[in-house]
């Protein structure tokens, strides 16, 4: 089997509500969709959702890298040879994990369809039967965040990820307000998105949060400062998660060596796709570090890819892949049974793509043959 053509679609996914985190606000989510064709008529879909605050890639640069650098090198290659595909991509250009993830996901979709198996069967088989779905609370004033959490409990949600990271005192008020409103039996995870910057600010915040039964604090400091995460972990009993600070095996080795995290957040857009995500999970398992699979607020394409990784690995104990629930329109049909997610047994990614919606949401496109 050979890759004969790769279509690229730069789309914007409309959000139900603005998505607000420590370093930005989004009214829609820009994404690059890859449609990979083969000489056997099998088509695979991939996705890259860039975040220039995390990997240094943008929507435009990801499209450009795919069009001019990666896809020309892959025409004629066998998408089943995923180790070789990644080696070729790495030898062609350093970094750009989001662009590489889009190719990787499309290859796995093709592999699954060729073998008539869901992707999770190609990377270890199904370990988990279901995962709870966590609702993500965007940054707002304390009362509004508490009110949104209360309304989501009525819809069945039992866990929340709170976005904070603007000001330590205000963030503490936000977390206290949500905990007071939802009670002690609801899970709360706090994602700072690097917003507390350093260990001093973080330790100040943590001293005020110890009594609030927080599941974990995610990436409070600047991504590259793994030393600070290790220092904070030595000073607190609150579990710490590293997100932006983990991209590749290089950072994972440092995290393990410094004992810098209780848990890590693996994202396909940060590491380069399904294949490297599995490698990270295996590294973490050897060190006894639990994993989560998260996302950059992706469509059904990349979200389903993340779920396949999560469902196949024992060491992955939580997921935050809620992008499709946040869009008014999506190009795929990934199904959620809120408050749970359960995967089907369809081959490949297990989703159908609505080509009409894909064209409707496309801002610009191209094809490489």
From Swiss-Prot:
Keywords tagged on the record: Isomerase, Magnesium, Metal-binding
Cofactor note: Binds 1 Mg(2+) ion per subunit.
One Pfam family of this chain: MR_MLE_C
GO process terms (BP): peptide metabolic process
GO molecular function: amino-acid racemase activity; magnesium ion binding; racemase and epimerase activity
Cross-referenced InterPro entries: Dipeptide_epimerase, Enolase-like_C_sf, Enolase-like_N, Enolase_C-like, Mandelate_racemase_C, Mandelate_racemase_N_dom
Cofactor(s) needed for function: Mg(2+)
Record-listed Mg(2+) binding positions: 191, 218, 243
The protein's Enzyme Commission number: 5.1.1.-
Listed Gene3D superfamilies: Enolase-like C-terminal domain, Enolase-like, N-terminal domain
Protein name per UniProt: N-succinyl-L-Arg/Lys racemase
């Amino acid at each position: 089997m050979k890759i004969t053509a790769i279509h690229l679609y730069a789309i914007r996914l409309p959000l139900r509500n603005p998505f607000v985190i420590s370093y930005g606000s989004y009214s829609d989510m820009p994404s690059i969709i890859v449609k990979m064709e083969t000489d056997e008529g099998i088509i695979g879909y991939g996705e890259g959702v860039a975040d220039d605050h995390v990997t240094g890639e943008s929507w435009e640069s990801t499209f450009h890298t795919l069009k001019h650098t990666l896809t020309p090198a892959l025409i004629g290659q066998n998408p089943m040879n995923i180790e070789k595909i990644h080696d070729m991509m790495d030898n062609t250009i350093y970094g750009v994990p989001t662009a590489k993830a889009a190719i990787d996901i499309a290859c796995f979709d093709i592999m699954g369809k060729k073998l008539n198996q869901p992707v999770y069967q190609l990377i270890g088989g199904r370990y988990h039967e279901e995962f709870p779905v966590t609702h993500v609370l965007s940054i707002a004033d304390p009362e509004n965040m508490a009110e949104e959490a209360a309304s989501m409990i009525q819809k069945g949600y039992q866990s929340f990820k709170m976005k904070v990271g603007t000001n330590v005192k205000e963030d503490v008020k936000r977390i206290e307000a949500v905990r007071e409103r939802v009670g002690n039996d609801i899970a709360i995870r706090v994602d700072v998105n690097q917003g507390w910057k350093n260990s001093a600010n973080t330790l100040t915040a943590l001293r005020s949060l110890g009594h609030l039964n927080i599941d974990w604090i995610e990436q409070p400091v600047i991504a590259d400062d793994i030393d600070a995460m290790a220092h904070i972990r030595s000073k607190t009993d609150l579990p710490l998660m590293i997100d932006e600070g983990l991209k590749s095996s290089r950072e994972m080795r440092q995290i393990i060596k410094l004992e810098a995290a209780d848990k890590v957040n693996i994202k396909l857009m940060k590491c380069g796709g399904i294949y490297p995500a599995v490698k990270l999970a295996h590294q973490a398992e050897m060190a006894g570090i639990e994993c989560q699979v998260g996302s950059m607020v992706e469509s059904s394409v990349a979200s389903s890819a993340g779920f396949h990784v999560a469902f196949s690995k024992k060491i992955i104990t939580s997921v935050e892949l809620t992008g499709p629930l946040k869009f008014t329109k999506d190009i795929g049909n990934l199904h959620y049974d809120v408050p749970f997610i359960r995967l089907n047994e369809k081959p490949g990614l297990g989703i159908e793509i609505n080509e009409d919606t894909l064209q409707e949401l496309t801002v610009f496109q191209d094809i490489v043959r």
